[in-house]
Amino acid sequence: MCPLSPASHNRRTGRPRSADADRAILAATREALAELGWSGLTLGDVAARAGVAKTTLYRRWAGKNELVVDAVAALFEEQLELPDLGSLQADIQGVVLRFAALLDRPETKTALMACIAEATHDDALRLRIRDAIVDRQKHLVLTGRVRAQQRGELPPDDGPADPARDDLIFDVVAGSVVHRVMVSSQPVDDAWALRLARLLVVGLAGVHNGP
């Protein structure tokens, strides 16, 4: 998985980073966000919950936006993987089920919805969400395609990389699951995940063979 780097470009210098402290801070951030909401969350409250000094947070994050986005991103980095289940269809079904289960966790759902709501009027936050959460998970598309090509399920690439194609595949998978779980509040069970996987396998063949 891609390493998580929660600091901003102007990170202050200080003592060496502690992975344990980072994990505690990010977990405390998600907990506080679920209880207090975006407007009620403060770095002081997060520091108290994590058992660290508030200055520790300011050495790592420029402010609340950066901290909350990285707290959400950490869940995806730690929990979301593309399983190798022997076929492209099975791999897609597996990652869909894992993604849905992750989104259905109260801490994920609350934190992600808070980020999205706040980002509707904060362009910088929206860009940070894209960079820290969305773009970092697009490697799952690349991994799945390489596996499928090695199995002979998809043809090898015959030209330069096509980021637009990868974005389309990612958007179809992620958008379908996010809408199902967080908008329509419908279950993502084995049957639904299988139907989506079958649809995607047919569509992927068209994407790879089309213009």
Feature map (PLM): residue ranges:
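Basic, helix-initiating cap at the start of DNA-binding domains
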Residues: 1-49, 55, 66
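C-terminal peripheral helix-coil segments that are non-catalytic and often amphipathic
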Residues: 1-13, 143-150, 167, 172, ...
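Short amphipathic alpha-helical segment with a characteristic S/N-K-E followed by hydrophobic residues
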Residues: 25, 40, 63-68, 78-79, ...
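Amphipathic alpha-helical segments used for helix-helix packing
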Residues: 66, 71-72, 104-131
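Hydrophobic alpha-helical connector segments
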Residues: 80-109, 162
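Amphipathic alpha-helical packing segments from all-alpha helical-bundle domains
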Residues: 110, 123-151, 167
